[in-house]
A protein has these predicted regions:
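C-terminal-of-GTPase-core extension/linker across diverse P-loop GTPases
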Residues: 1-19, 23, 38, 143-220, ...
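Flexible beta-alpha connector loops of hexameric P-loop NTPases
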Residues: 24-29, 59-63, 123-129, 171, ...
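Switch I (effector-binding) loop of TRAFAC-class P-loop GTPase G-domains
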Residues: 2-4, 197, 203-210, 228-260, ...
Length: 429
């Protein structure tokens, strides 16, 4: 008999081989892109055991990589006892099917998009988030159904990366017509959620609160910034895509001006277009903001490329022309020389540490200044019977002059742009 009770052990992580291609016009160095792919694989529960790379002008139509590299990959899979091969670029359904036959069962072949979708499936917490992930997964799977029929039963029993798509659902067991019907049904459900969100957003729009949205590369520290600023306890982890569902918190700026700040899903290079499309309702929080804080990990050597990736996604969702403020986070990890370099190169940006709180006062001051810049200077004679409007000016505006007249109050005040129209009929200038 055992002297100690047996403790259940965690399942062994899947052994993954990463495959990357160095293209002539690579925006990122291949090794850095594969580093990020390895972090994605780790987030999904895999252990990277080897890497394989090739320099190409364009992918091979049948196999994506050359035949010699396919043979090398097969040998590497055997030697490393790999469970899954992850490509850093998108594979066509026929390329994926060819490679699966080449390496042999039970090894899985997936691409970067499938890996990101898998992580989203793990991290979606709300009904809206799960609906959006299911939609993106089904859109990805639909053109791949032909090659999946022979592997479907095995995938569902093997588990692990690439097999969590639609867990608990039967959509993979039905034909294309039913898949399309499911996609249509998900779109309708998401539309209903959007309508409820629109009601909530309209309520926020009608309030005088200055609306701020956090946007940035995944793991740049957006959730930690939200927690540091508002004193909340939003989940913050050193993992890619730890936050999928938008979270809004309230904050009062110096002088009493109200503010809402919303944390949103992180961006990443090669972000699948299907995810951008599926998460449009979530990303609409960025579109509705008065100010977008672009949060950047200053300690990452690829911070400039990450900032470019964020700008591309903002452009894609129609937020490229919105008012933005760049916040370089994690400056506690920089030495004095690097900090000085950032200040010289980005004089309009805020240097900040969500971990230690350094730079918090500067950040709040910059947000307050941006909020004040959107205010409207207004003079009005408000009749005494409109006591609610007079109170509104005192509570929501900055009163510059107040004079009591025989039939009302003459005020000169700076008011939030969303409040000023309520006084328009009494305006005197």
């Amino acid at each position: 008999m055992a002297r100690f009770p047996l403790v259940p052990t965690a399942p062994e992580p899947e052994r993954a081989i990463l495959v990357g291609v160095e293209w002539r016009d690579n925006a990122w160095p291949l090794d850095r892109s594969l580093d990020e792919l390895e972090r994605l694989a780790h987030t999904a529960g895999a252990q990277c055991v080897a890497r394989l790379s090739q320099r190409l002008v364009k992918p091979y139509p049948k196999s994506f990589i050359g035949s010699g590299k396919v043979e090398e990959l097969c040998g590497l899979v055997h030697r490393m006892d790999a469970d899954v091969v992850i490509f850093d670029d998108d594979l066509t359904p026929s390329q994926q099917s060819y490679l699966e036959k080449a390496v042999g069962e039970p090894v899985k072949i997936i691409d970067r998009t499938a890996l990101i979708l898998d992580i989203f499936g793990l991290h979606a917490q709300t009904r809206e988030g799960r609906l959006q992930v299911q939609l993106a997964q089904l859109q990805y799977l639909l053109p791949r159904l032909r090659g999946m029929w022979s592997h479907l039963a095995k995938e569902q029993t093997r588990g692990g990366i690439g097999s969590r798509f639609g867990q608990g659902e039967s959509q993979l067991e039905v034909d294309r017509r039913l898949i399309r019907n499911k996609i249509a049904a998900l779109r309708r459900e998401i539309k209903q959620v959007e309508q409820r969100r629109d009601v909530q957003s309209k309520s926020r729009i009608e309030s005088s609160a200055f609306r701020v949205a956090l946007a940035g590369y995944t793991n740049a520290g957006k959730s930690t910034l939200l927690n540091r600023l508002t004193g909340s306890t939003v989940l913050s982890q050193d993992k890619l895509f730890a936050t999928l569902d938008p979270t809004t918190r309230s904050y009062r700026l110096p002088g009493g001006r109200g503010m809402t700040i919303t944390d949103t899903v992180g961006f990443i290079q090669k972000l699948p277009h299907g995810l951008v499309d599926a998460f449009k309702s979530t990303l609409s929080e960025v579109l509705g903001a008065d100010l977008i804080l672009k949060v950047v990990d200053a300690s990452d050597e690829d911070y400039e490329r990450q900032l470019e990736a964020v700008d591309r996604v903002l452009d894609e969702i129609g937020a490229g022309e919105r008012l933005t403020l760049t916040v370089f986070n994690k400056i506690d990890l920089l030495d004095s020389v690097d900090r000085l370099s950032f200040r010289r190169r980005f004089p309009e940006a805020v240097l900040f540490s969500a971990q230690t709180g350094e730079g918090l006062d500067d950040l709040v001051d910059r947000i307050a200044r941006e909020a004040a810049a959107t205010d409207v200077l207004l003079s009005a004679d408000i009749p005494y019977r409109e006591g609610a409007l007079i109170t509104l000016v005192h509570e929501q505006g900055t009163l510059l002059h107040e004079e009591y007249l025989e039939d009302g109050v003459r005020i000169v005040a700076k008011l939030p742009a969303r409040v000023a129209p309520r006084l328009e009929r009494y305006r005197t200038e």
